């Protein structure tokens, strides 16, 4: 959530910066609510002052034995008006809060202004795409004989679900374990196991609600007035970041660095017809997430560090990739700045997103009331960052395509062999005649 004081000081400036993100701030609606709020607060202060004055007057009158009934009646009327004003003020505050909850974060000044992904800026590349001396297959054609089972996944749960079998399932697990081990043993993150189902207020904290309710899978139990609504997490960023919700941590405890491997659930409501083949876009997928909670003056150094941690996974796996800076129109709702890592997929002859690393600055912290005690001993909002380290399913896709062989087998990357019992190659199971 943005700082409402910023809007009160520079409403037109905020509106312009939000317009760079493709968001139209209803300046008239905000101004009208603010004017009404100020008027009610001013009137309430006047009523409070009048009531205090009358209370003193009543005390003096009683001391003289004078009749106070008229003054008492006026005090009662003031009390009634103040109650009505408080109710009206509460209504206005709710409407202001609803308006604020729908506003995206303001982009950092270093973010390129643009409309969509066409305006993103490439930062660097690593690795050279492999040259094949045979016809390259996509991950579906490579993986299906080896244990990718789209048919059974669809039979069990519908479109955009996949079953993994045998060595492919083991490779998928190996990738997640390798990522977690790298982040915990080499990058300083603390491994965390989180709930996969969370309460609605947790999603408000990280920014998925109220705007993206249609992208979430909702779980309801009970019935009628006793219905309890919860949501499946779309990323473990949600659970990890909210661990500092409604708390004040000591400055000496920062940075807090957490990582988790979890399934993620997304309805993909706005992606009809996109990436319908294979594992690129699924309703259920695994991801290893990185989260950092840091002091404000350290957050952009932490962002660069987090990008480096995601890059390290790709480099250890020998997968070519590029890093891009997302433009204002392509960033996620809560982000102030985002770097995407895109891995090379030879069958598509292009780079595809495999990690997104974002600094949300104080945007999530303000929604969560997550603070730290600064050097002066005063509570101050933390900055929160999140990044994929990496999306496990898409990494599996990249391994299958980049390490495929002419005979249909897949070479196991060296970094994964300790997690695969020393296996160097995945071959299709022998067919029984």
Curated annotation (Swiss-Prot):
Belongs to the class-II aminoacyl-tRNA synthetase family. Type-1 seryl-tRNA synthetase subfamily. Its main location: cytoplasm. The gene is serS. It is an enzyme of class 6 (ligase). Keywords: Aminoacyl-tRNA synthetase, ATP-binding, Cytoplasm, Ligase, Nucleotide-binding, Protein biosynthesis. Catalyzes the attachment of serine to tRNA(Ser). Is also able to aminoacylate tRNA(Sec) with serine, to form the misacylated tRNA L-seryl-tRNA(Sec), which will be further converted into selenocysteinyl-tRNA(Sec). ATP binds at residues 266-268, 353-356. GO terms for molecular function: ATP binding; serine-tRNA ligase activity. GO terms for biological process: selenocysteine biosynthetic process; seryl-tRNA aminoacylation. InterPro entries: aa-tRNA-synt_IIb, aa-tRNA-synth_II, aa-tRNA-synth_II/BPL/LPL, Ser-tRNA-ligase_type_1, Ser-tRNA-synth_1_N, SerRS_1_N_sf, SerRS_core, tRNA-bd_arm. The lineage of its organism: Bacteria, Pseudomonadati, Pseudomonadota, Betaproteobacteria, Burkholderiales. It catalyses: tRNA(Ser) + L-serine + ATP = L-seryl-tRNA(Ser) + AMP + diphosphate + H(+); tRNA(Sec) + L-serine + ATP = L-seryl-tRNA(Sec) + AMP + diphosphate + H(+). GO terms for cellular component: cytoplasm. Homodimer. The tRNA molecule binds across the dimer. It is found in: Cytoplasm. Pathway: Aminoacyl-tRNA biosynthesis; selenocysteinyl-tRNA(Sec) biosynthesis; L-seryl-tRNA(Sec) from L-serine and tRNA(Sec): step 1/1. Pfam families: Seryl_tRNA_N (PF02403), tRNA-synt_2b (PF00587). Consists of two distinct domains, a catalytic core and a N-terminal extension that is involved in tRNA binding. This is Serine--tRNA ligase. It comes from the Bacteria.
């Amino acid at each position: 959530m943005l700082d409402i004081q910023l809007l009160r000081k520079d409403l037109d400036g905020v509106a312009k910066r939000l317009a760079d993100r493709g968001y139209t701030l209803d300046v008239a609606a905000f101004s009208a609510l603010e004017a009404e709020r100020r008027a009610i607060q001013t009137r309430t202060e006047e009523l409070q002052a009048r009531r205090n004055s009358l209370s003193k007057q009543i005390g003096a009158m009683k001391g003289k034995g004078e009749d106070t009934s008229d003054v008492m009646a006026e005090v009662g009327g003031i009390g009634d008006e103040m109650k009505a004003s408080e109710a009206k003020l509460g209504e206005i505050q709710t409407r202001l809060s609803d308006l604020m909850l729908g506003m995206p974060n303001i982009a950092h000044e270093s973010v390129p202004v643009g409309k969509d992904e066409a305006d993103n800026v490439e930062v660097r590349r690593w690795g050279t795409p492999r040259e094949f001396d045979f016809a390259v297959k996509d991950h579906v054609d490579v993986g299906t004989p080896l244990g990718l089972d789209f048919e059974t996944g669809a039979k069990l749960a519908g479109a955009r679900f996949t079953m993994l079998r045998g060595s492919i399932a083991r490779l998928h697990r190996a990738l997640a374990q390798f990522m977690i081990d790298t982040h915990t043993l080499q990058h300083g993150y603390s491994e965390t196991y989180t709930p996969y189902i969370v309460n609605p207020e947790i999603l408000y904290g990280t920014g998925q609600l109220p705007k993206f309710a249609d992208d979430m899978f909702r779980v309801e139990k009970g019935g009628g007035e006793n219905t309890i609504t919860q949501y499946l997490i779309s990323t473990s960023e949600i659970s990890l970041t909210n661990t500092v919700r409604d708390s004040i941590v000591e400055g000496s405890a920062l940075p807090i660095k957490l990582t988790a491997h979890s399934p993620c659930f997304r309805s993909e409501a706005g992606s009809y017809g996109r990436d319908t083949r294979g594992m690129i876009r699924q309703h259920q997928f695994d991801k290893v997430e990185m989260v950092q909670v840091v002091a404000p003056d350290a957050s952009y150094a932490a962002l660069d560090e987090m990008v480096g941690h995601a890059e390290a996974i790709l480099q250890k796996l020998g997968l070519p990739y590029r890093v891009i800076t997302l433009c204002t129109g392509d960033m996620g709702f809560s982000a102030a700045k985002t770097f995407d890592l895109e891995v090379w997929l030879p069958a598509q002859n292009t780079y595809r997103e495999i990690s997104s690393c974002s600094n949300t600055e104080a945007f999530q912290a303000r929604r969560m009331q997550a603070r730290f005690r600064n050097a002066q001993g005063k509570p101050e909002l933390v900055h929160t960052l999140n990044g994929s380290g990496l999306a496990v399913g898409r990494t599996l896709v990249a391994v299958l395509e980049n390490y495929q062989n002419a005979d249909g087998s897949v070479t196991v990357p060296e970094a994964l062999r300790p997690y695969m019992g020393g296996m160097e190659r995945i071959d299709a199971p022998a067919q029984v005649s």
